[in-house]
């Protein structure tokens, strides 16, 4: 099956292992260095050895993704920083644009692709300027502009906006002769190849109901979430749940849970308003799914009386409901009227737009 190597970010002794966790008792003294990977000139094997996965959220093993050959194709760096509030990818691009370009060149060589694109929103002006300078003398790497909307970082949106190819629900970028990789994933590829470094660190954004919202770069994977809530000045009271991820697709998390390879955001929410009335929930692939929307309704003390799906939701080849055109909302008036007829007094929506 699919999987990736796991490396501890701090030194210590393994105390226990179960299906979800490897618990390490940390040594009192920690080195500033890390145990380097064995030297190799095989870059694809190096990526596999490092345990790199798609750190933007999907978690797919990068060594498997980059084993595909796409001669004449395209490698696209997903620089959308898709979810609101999050800012660590933008910070990286502002500060290390040349490193991102080097990473793209490694992937071009691995996959046989002819061109590399950095797909980014226009609102990230400082990052755009830095990347423009870094790409100036790179004939095979250029910048592609994404619309300032959610979910601009969806792979099918990126393919549509950069290559002009509309993928059907369930189709992968490979069917457009393209490979897409999140910018932080590319950062970790560069570290593995140039520094013999395994994937042991993560960039995160901490925001919401904390005193000092901030971006933390290269934090050790495995430390508890509570450490970074504290580093951000602690909670502002009253506060609600911690959301791991972004506002649209994040999920509830507990303080004691660890930072993992795909953690990007830690957002402290407001307490749920106690509406205690009948609501409808509107589901779309672009946002929160039914389970999450029901959690929100429960937190509000509301009764779910109607469940509707965006009319763009269609089954893919595996029967999973997917959005036909992510980011292009068809309007939800018909669905809202249906929920009203079902007795809903309010709507909790998981769609990409109003």
Regions found by a protein language model. Name each.
Residues 94-111, 295-297:
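Histidine-anchored nucleotide/phosphate-binding helix
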Residues 23-26, 30-79, 84-87:
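Hydrophobic alpha-helical hairpins/lids featuring a short glycine-rich hinge
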Residues 92-98, 123, 305-354:
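Cofactor-cradling patches in redox/metallo enzymes
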Residues 75-89, 210, 313-319:
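Gly-rich Lys/Arg/Thr-decorated short loops/hinges at beta-loop-alpha junctions or inter-strand turns
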Residues 234, 249-284, 288, 294-299:
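A glycine- and small/hydrophobic-rich beta-loop-beta segment
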Residues 1, 7-16:
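Generic structural motif
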Residues 114-225, 231-238, 246:
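Hydrophobic alpha-helical positions that pack around
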Residues 279-324:
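Redox- and metal-dependent alpha/beta enzyme cores, enriched for Fe-S-associated oxidoreductases
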């Amino acid at each position: 099956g699919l999987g990736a190597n796991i490396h501890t970010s701090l030194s210590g002794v393994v105390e226990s292992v179960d299906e979800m966790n490897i618990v390490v008792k940390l040594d009192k003294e920690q080195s500033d260095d890390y145990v380097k990977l064995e030297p190799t000139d095989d870059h694809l094997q190096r990526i596999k050895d490092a345990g790199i996965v798609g750190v933007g959220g999907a978690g797919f093993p990068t060594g498997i993704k980059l084993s595909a050959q796409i001669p004449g194709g395209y490698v696209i760096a997903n620089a959308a920083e898709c979810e609101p509030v999050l800012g660590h990818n933008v910070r990286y691009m502002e500060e290390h644009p040349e490193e991102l370009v080097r990473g793209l060149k490694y992937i071009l060589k691995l996959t046989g692709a002819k061109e590399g694109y950095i797909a980014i929103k226009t609102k990230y002006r400082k990052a755009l300027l830095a990347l423009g300078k870094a790409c100036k003398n790179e004939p095979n790497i250029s910048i592609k502009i994404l619309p300032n909307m959610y979910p601009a970082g969806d792979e099918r949106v990126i393919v549509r906006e950069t290559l002009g190819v509309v993928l059907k629900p369930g189709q992968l970028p490979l069917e457009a002769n393209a490979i897409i990789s999140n910018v932080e994933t590319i950062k970790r590829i560069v570290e593995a190849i140039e520094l013999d470094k395994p994937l042991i660190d993560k960039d995160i954004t901490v925001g919401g109901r904390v005193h000092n919202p901030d971006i933390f770069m290269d934090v050790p994977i495995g430390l508890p979430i509570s450490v970074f809530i504290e580093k951000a000045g602690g909670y502002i009271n009253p506060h609600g749940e911690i959301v791991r991820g972004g506002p649209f697709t994040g999920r509830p998390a507990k303080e004691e849970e660890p930072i993992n390879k795909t953690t990007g955001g830690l957002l402290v929410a407001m307490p749920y308003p106690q509406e205690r009335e009948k609501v409808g929930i509107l589901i779309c692939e672009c946002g929160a799914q039914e389970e999450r929307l029901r959690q929100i309704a429960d937190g509000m003390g509301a009764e779910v009386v109607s469940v509707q799906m965006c009319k763009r939701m269609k089954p893919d080849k595996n029967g999973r409901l997917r959005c036909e055109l992510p980011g292009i909302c068809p309007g939800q008036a018909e669905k809202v009227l249906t929920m009203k007829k079902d007795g809903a007094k309010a709507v909790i929506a998981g769609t990409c737009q109003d």
